[in-house]
A protein has these predicted regions:
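Conserved class I S-adenosyl-L-methionine
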Residues: 1-41, 52-56, 73-76, 80, 132-163, 193-197, ...
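Class I SAM-dependent methyltransferase SAM/SAH-binding core
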Residues: 44, 50-93, 118
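A conserved beta-strand element that flanks and buttresses the S-adenosyl-L-methionine
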Residues: 105
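Short catalytic micro-motifs in class I SAM-dependent methyltransferases
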Residues: 108-112
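A short glycine-rich, Lys/Arg-flanked "PGG" loop and its adjoining helix->strand segment in the class I
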Residues: 117-131
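Short alpha-helix
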Residues: 160-176, 182
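Conserved Class I S-adenosyl-L-methionine
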Residues: 181-273
Length: 273
């Protein structure tokens, strides 16, 4: 799924990853709904990591397979969920025959994929119908993260790695998907999966090194000087009460993340009749 150097990154992140990156139950429920999941369906998780969401959705139904480029992550997945199928593979060369699955998902992985639309073409190839559901952030949304105030370089670099909504729609269309729609997702204070903007309503989370260690942007895209100065400013603003004014300046109605739901031609026609 990931570029080679990022596979190595996640091999180093793997141990202890699940301490802060647990599957969020509400997010898992939304993924299942957007997939239009069926108990007898066959589903693929692209960039499954330690398999938290693969396992969470498998408990709702279906036969699940996960792929990832990180050996360490997959070892964690196999250890915790031996009953599911795990494969070391790249998203631009999926090791499955055509029409193997009834649906697929990819959560917070778009910034690690090789040049689009090739991975999307591969996902479309292995689907016999159904939907491809992505959970991602758009650069337009990230510009409204209050993290930008404290870690501007990190957020700018992170945003450059993610396709815009229009570019993502175009890549999915080029890959053969139809009826692409977007549903915004707003971070709440009870989010269990502590990814990049999970601390939107809980800024003190970013002061915890264990939380930052399992967020790839902090691991690889935040230089040491910005990390030190940003954390110092955040801690100072939290003590003084100035943080609330900073957060208000970044308020947005765009949502913090988004579900991108792409139908196959077969799925669309089945809905039309």
């Amino acid at each position: 799924v990931t570029r080679p150097e990022e596979g190595a990154l996640y091999d180093s992140i793997g141990p202890g990853y699940q301490t802060t990156r647990r599957a969020d139950s509400h997010l898992a429920a939304l993924l299942w709904d957007h997939l239009n999941g069926r108990p007898a369906g066959r589903y693929l998780d692209v960039g499954c990591g330690t398999g938290n969401y693969t396992a969470a959705l498998s408990r709702r139904g279906g036969v699940w397979t996960g792929i990832d480029a990180s050996d360490s992550m997959l070892q964690e997945a196999r250890r915790a969920h031996a009953d599911l199928s795990w494969h070391h593979a790249s998203a631009d060369n999926l090791p499955f025959p055509d029409s193997s699955f009834d649906g697929a998902m990819a959560t917070l992985v778009i910034h690690h994929l090789q040049a689009l639309p090739r991975p999307f073409q591969e996902v479309r190839r292995v689907l016999c119908g159904g939907r491809f559901v992505l959970f991602t952030a758009f650069p337009e949304q990230m510009q409204h993260y209050w993290l930008h105030h404290y870690f501007p370089g990190m957020i700018e670099r992170s945003a450059r790695m993610i396709p815009s909504e229009s570019a993502l729609r175009a890549a999915l269309s080029d890959a053969g998907f139809t009826s692409v729609r977007v549903e915004p997702f707003h971070v709440t204070c009870d989010l269990q999966d502590l990814f990049l903007y999970a601390g939107k309503e809980r800024p003190e989370l970013y002061l915890d090194p264990a939380v930052r260690a399992n967020i790839s942007s902090f691991r690889t895209l935040c230089d040491e000087s910005e990390r030190v100065s940003g954390l110092g400013a955040l801690e100072s603003d939290l003590r003084s009460g100035a943080f609330e004014a900073v957060a208000r300046r970044y308020a947005s109605t765009l949502g913090d993340y988004a579900f991108v739901i792409a139908d196959t031609e077969i799925q669309r026609h089945s809905l039309d009749h």
